[in-house]
Amino acid sequence: MINKEFNKLIKEDAGYREDCSLCKESKLMVGQKTPYGAIIICKGSDQKNGWFATLSPKTGGNIKKDFTIQIMPIPHINHISELGSNEELAKNYGLAFSQAGKAITKIMREENRHLENEEKVVRIGMYGKSKHPEEHLHIKLFPWEHPYVVDSTYENKEIQVDEEENEFVKMTPVKKAIIDEKRFNYLAEKLINILK
C-alpha cells in the first residue's frame, strides 16, 4: 500500500492546472507582476524541466532590510520527492536554488548585512512547503534574520508548560508586512539583473 501510494505520488501529472495560481504565474515573463503582487525575477525557458522565481511584496522580517525569494518548478510538482524521477528538473532546481542564494548573498553583502552577526557571514534561511496534496511546490529563501523556527535556536529557550502539561516555548508572532514600494522595485530590478 505504501509503495503504491509513493509510486502514485512520483508519477503524478505535472501538467498545467488552470485552478493553480502558481501554474498561472509560470506563464508570466521576467519583470511582470503576479496577482499577489510578486514580481517574476527569473525564469527558465523549458516548460517541462524549468523553474521560475519571484520576489514577494511582503516579508515576515524587517521591511527595511529583509525580503523573500520564492522558487517554483514550471511544471505542477506537488512534492520535493517528485524531483527524483526527473533528472533535468532536479538539475535545474539545483541551479535555480543556487542562483537565488547567490543573488541574496550579493545584495546582503552590498548592504553589509554580514556585519550584523558575530561570525561576519551572510546567513540565508530557506523552507519549502505544500499545505495539501494538490498544492504546487514552492521553496522560499530569505535573509537569515527573517523570523524562522530552527531547532538549535529554540532548544535553548525556556520551556513553558500549559495546564494540560504540554510543553512549548514563547516566541514572537511572525506578521507579514508590505515592503516599501521604492525598496521593492529596487530589489526586483537588482535581482533581475543578477539573475540574467
List each language-model region with its residue ranges.
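HIT superfamily nucleotide-processing domains
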Residues: 1-196
